[in-house]
């Protein structure tokens, strides 16, 4: 099925569900590609929440909240023994 | 309470890969650089704070000592941010590991001492003998001064490790005690909770003070030797 725009240049929200696997496989998975993805993501967040005229505490707090959440996921294995349950 | 109180201090490893590298590198994300004259609030605040700290800390040095400004400022930022991030729940504090603190203390101290020995050999050797000691005491005093010199990096590292580890342990213990006391007697639990609040405030202060002390001492050793 020929699309008007080639699959490679579509953004994620414009990709149809059936085309999703091929879209994912077409992404750039080289080290420089992955580094570019991280850099793009960082600057997207930075320019939206921090690098604005009246930045608030929310820009920093969201990062710290994500950090706390990731650390929780990392230590879940030890933490699940401390839940208040009768049988662990 | 963990089956072992120290499980929160183990180095995080995920599937055998050292996650600790990422955790050590994380604070660098919180200090964005900017080449502009007028920046956003976040960067402006950080630059203001950095200017305040660097003026206060580097004003005592001569021009040779002030070449260390970048090193000392990065040091205080790193230790301060790592300690403060460690106060978040479930996070891992790299400065609780003695290995890392030794890795910071020994090269910095050695750099300062060796600079002193290379450039001002007589003055550096003269540090081993305080002024006006009676002659019979000289050999013993030289030995004591040598020992006190070599203990400086150990003291730097152990001071930081012990302070941060002890604070975290206390928070764990008192938090666990509050939780356990909740079902037994609510008033005691409230008292323990107040203690926990005060302790947390103390820990915030300690986090920043320890960074300051570490950097200040390195700067002092530098001042002696330049």
UniProtKB/Swiss-Prot annotation, chain A:
Record keyword Mitochondrion present: yes
Residue numbers bearing the N-acetylalanine modification: 2
UniProt similarity note: Belongs to the ATPase F chain family.
Function comment: Subunit f, of the mitochondrial membrane ATP synthase complex (F(1)F(0) ATP synthase or Complex V) that produces ATP from ADP in the presence of a proton gradient across the membrane which is generated by electron transport complexes of the respiratory chain. ATP synthase complex consist of a soluble F(1) head domain - the catalytic core - and a membrane F(1) domain - the membrane proton channel. These two domains are linked by a central stalk rotating inside the F(1) region and a stationary peripheral stalk.
A GO biological-process term: proton motive force-driven mitochondrial ATP synthesis
Organism for this UniProt entry: Bos taurus (Bovine)
Transmembrane regions: 62-79
Subcellular location, record wording: Mitochondrion; Mitochondrion inner membrane
Gene: ATP5MF
Oligomeric form and interacting partners: Component of the ATP synthase complex composed at least of ATP5F1A/subunit alpha, ATP5F1B/subunit beta, ATP5MC1/subunit c (homooctomer), MT-ATP6/subunit a, MT-ATP8/subunit 8, ATP5ME/subunit e, ATP5MF/subunit f, ATP5MG/subunit g, ATP5MK/subunit k, ATP5MJ/subunit j, ATP5F1C/subunit gamma, ATP5F1D/subunit delta, ATP5F1E/subunit epsilon, ATP5PF/subunit F6, ATP5PB/subunit b, ATP5PD/subunit d, ATP5PO/subunit OSCP.
Membrane topology type: Single-pass membrane protein
Phosphoserine PTM sites in chain numbering: 3
Protein name: ATP synthase F(0) complex subunit f, mitochondrial
One Pfam family hit: WRW
Principal location: mitochondrion
N6-acetyllysine PTM sites in chain numbering: 16
Keywords: Acetylation, ATP synthesis, CF(0), Hydrogen ion transport, Ion transport, Membrane, Mitochondrion, Mitochondrion inner membrane, Phosphoprotein, Transmembrane, Transmembrane helix, Transport
Recorded GO CC terms: mitochondrial inner membrane; mitochondrion; proton-transporting ATP synthase complex
Domain of life according to the entry: Eukaryota
UniProt key word Nucleotidyltransferase: no
